Amino acid sequence: MAGYPKIIHTEEGMRDGLQIEDRDIPVAAKIRLLNALSLTGLQEINVGSFVSPKYTPQMACVDELISGFEPQPGVKYTYTALNDKGVERAKAYSPPLSPRVSELSTRVDMCDAFAQRNTNRTQAQQIAVWPKTIARAVEKGVKEGGMSISNVWGSNWIGQVPFEQHMLMFDRMYRMWEDAGIPVTKVGMADATGWNMPHEVERTLVGLKERYPTIKDFNLHLHNARGVALASIYAALKVLDGSDTLRLQTSIGGMAGCPYCGMGRAAMMIATEDLMHMLQEMGIHTGVDLYKLIECVWLAEEVVGHQLFGFTSKAGPRPHYDKLYAMDMPHIETLEQAKHFILGKKAYEGAHSPWNEPITSWQRPEAPGYKEKLAKQGEKPESIPGVQPKLVAR
């Protein structure tokens, strides 16, 4: 089937992002950020983790956060819990939190060292749980199974994981589900240490689709430590098609990280605004107001006290129609001045302007005789830069 896969996106700024930031950020500031995110058109937001503050002190206020924010209709609010105790805590806040869907999946980390650092279990202990997971699925009459691998392509402790090695691990899980009479329909790939590369992600997805035709649901949790995660998502969009579902997690401004991966905040995620900009420019509907989302990034920078890592929040989206730049605007040199795409002229007030006369051009849609001149050249207006259909209205 042609076309792009169905995309299900989860915003991780409140969870993966804030878990690596200052533990003393006031809860009121977090509530303000969550309220703003809720008004951007994002379909799903992870609000935080129900975990021990001993291990993740940044999440100590998650109960107060959920009690204090203003949920919006149409937004799915999710959470992270690593054990039954966390799940039970979260039940007290449903709604607004969406009930957790009970899905049984076999999981393993390709890096034994990271498994111990992150989950306090060895890889062998993770594998030993598989038969119990599948037996529970059989007992419950589950019709579909899932499998997931972390550090699929490598880690900072063992280096690169060859394609054949992680595919063999997928195959071991798949065969166990198959022997139990349960087809695997979902697969997850996590990359906490940022080892993804577009050509390797492509090869893995092609391999999965060729070997396991029952799988139609793919989850990619990619970190952007080496700056190529967005390209890896693009590779996934080209491999998968309209019969598939692609689940993605990103974070506003790219803020994210893991204290156990050895890189801290440098293990950032794809910036949500960069992903949404790319999808919209590819003609993929997101429902997100990109300008409101960028204002959330600026707010997040105030909350955490430092500049974040995305690009679209600094340069702005590719401008169309009424968003085209003023041709005689002055010299723009700083990041603050570049915010004129939202703030207008006040962003560059007082900047140096060398132009003696106003700059005009026939190539602007507002120019007299613009359409007629295009027609003489045999071109259609929508084929010229600056006159493409606007994808998101402000």
Could you describe each region identified by the protein language model?
Residues 1-394:
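Catalytic cores and adjacent flexible loops of soluble metabolic enzymes
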